[in-house]
């Protein structure tokens, strides 16, 4: 699922529903947006996450790579007092390099103390970034495992039913 509006700029995507209005009559009455303040703030947020490889903050999101789009979505998600970030298959359909950048972003967001719920079938990625793994099958949580104490093959065996779950780890 797309996390950005493709035919809008990076800045517009960063401020969806939270646009900064101009000061005074132009902003309060005529509702004019302060595009410069929005661009400056978007640039700062992307820079904070190490994402300023993007040349033009006003370029359309559809011109970005999949990894860059994920970066814009993560920057937006962490910019407005977010208490938790939910990422559903964030590396699906991305190349190796872009997937690596998304995993780095997850680490950067976690280092700020923002918890992340990562929904993924990519076990190497899950084991790399998770501090605990909730394993579900057919809509029911089977168990919670610690990736430092369990092998990836254990997780896959629980998911597929090859290994019965007799207790929560």
How should each PLM-predicted stretch be described?
Residues 1-2, 6-167:
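Glycine-rich phosphate-binding loops of nucleotide-dependent enzymes
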């Amino acid at each position: 699922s797309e996390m950005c509006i493709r035919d809008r700029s990076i800045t517009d995507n960063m401020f969806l529903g939270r646009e900064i209005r101009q000061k005074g009559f132009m902003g309060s009455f005529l509702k004019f947006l302060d595009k410069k303040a929005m661009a400056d703030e978007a640039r700062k947020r992307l820079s904070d996450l190490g994402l300023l490889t993007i040349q033009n903050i006003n370029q359309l999101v559809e011109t970005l790579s999949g990894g860059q789009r994920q970066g814009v979505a993560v920057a937006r998600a962490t910019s407005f007092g977010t208490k938790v970030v939910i990422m559903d298959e964030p590396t699906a359909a991305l190349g190796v390099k872009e997937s690596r950048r998304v995993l780095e972003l997850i680490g950067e967001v976690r280092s700020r103390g923002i918890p992340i719920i990562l929904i993924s079938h990519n076990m190497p990625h899950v084991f790399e970034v998770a501090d605990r793994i909730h394993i579900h099958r057919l809509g029911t949580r089977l168990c919670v495992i610690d990736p430092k104490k369990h092998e990836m093959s254990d997780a896959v065996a629980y998911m597929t039913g090859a290994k019965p779950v007799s207790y929560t780890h």
